[in-house]
Structure formats: C-alpha cells, structure tokens
C-alpha cells in the first residue's frame, strides 16, 4: 500500500498541496494543514470520502516526467467548461489574474497536482487537454463546471516574471 514506504517527516502532495507526514498507523497516515494552506487551496472544502490525487516526493536521481512541481499552491481556479474531444477532455479554467500568475500556450501548469500542458491561455484563464489515461488515473475525471481546483504555476515562469517585474 501507499503507506508502507512512507516515513514521518516525508512530504506527500494531496491534490498538489505539499503536506508533511506527522504520524503513521498501519495503512493510515496523518498530515497537518495550517490556516494559510486552507486559505490558499481547496483542501478546506474536502469532505470525508472525497478522492484526492496523492504523490510522494520525487527522487532527484529519476527521470522528470512532466515539469518541476513543488507542491506550493499559488491559488485556486474554477472550471468553466468541459468539452469531449475523441476520448480526451478539454477543461477550461478561470483564475484571479491580479495575483500576477501567468500561463502561456504550450507551457506547463499543475491542476490538483497533475502536470499538464496549456492548450490556450487568456489573461484570466486557460484550457488543458487531458488524455484518457490521465483521466482514469487521477481525480480530474470527477471535475464538473464550477469545481474549484488547486493551481501551481510553472516555477521557472514565476521567477522569470518576477525578474521582469523588477526591471
């Protein structure tokens, strides 16, 4: 099971939110989310039985399949449209652009901890196409219009944007 290899003090991403394991008892482990985490993410709205994406920290000696994801959620977004596209689905999201976060077409974004490629982008939104395999192995297939998701923007893009702002 997932918990067999866990150790106290390790990080586990829960829908993209990095949380530290503080206790383990058999197949159950415990994490702590502080007020800041609950305010910036959708974790506070989860109910018992909700399915979340779980991912352990990456080892630095393995291949990077996706983009660099830290588990530091920047903000939430709302799903505004879902369109079937030959077995895949295109999800559209809007977010508050006043935070200064940006996405670019063919760039990377993390939605609920899933590394995805941006199909198109606007000032306050973007869309991603999700293949059947990813839909089957994540909780993205459960999204509906109006669902709130956690976003982590590309860390390299965030640093570049900050450097440009400071000039």
Predicted regions and their residues:
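Conserved loop->alpha-helix
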Residues: 1-167
């Amino acid at each position: 099971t997932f918990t067999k290899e866990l150790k106290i003090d390790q990080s586990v991403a829960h829908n993209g939110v990095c949380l530290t394991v503080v206790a383990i008892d058999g197949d159950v482990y415990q994490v702590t989310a502080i007020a800041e985490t609950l305010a910036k993410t959708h974790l506070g709205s989860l109910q018992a039985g909700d399915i979340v994406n779980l991912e352990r920290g990456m080892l630095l000696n393995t291949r990077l399949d996706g983009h660099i994801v830290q588990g530091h959620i920047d903000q939430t977004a709302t799903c505004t449209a879902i369109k079937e596209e030959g077995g895949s689905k295109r999800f559209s999201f809007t977010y508050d652009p006043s935070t200064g976060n940006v996405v670019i077409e063919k760039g990377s974004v993390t939605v609920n901890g899933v590394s995805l490629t941006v199909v198109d982008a606007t000032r306050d939104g973007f869309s991603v196409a999700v293949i059947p395999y990813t839909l089957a192995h994540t909780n993205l297939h459960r999204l509906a219009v109006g669902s709130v998701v956690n976003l982590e923007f590309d860390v390299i893009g965030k640093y570049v944007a900050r450097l440009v702002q400071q000039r």
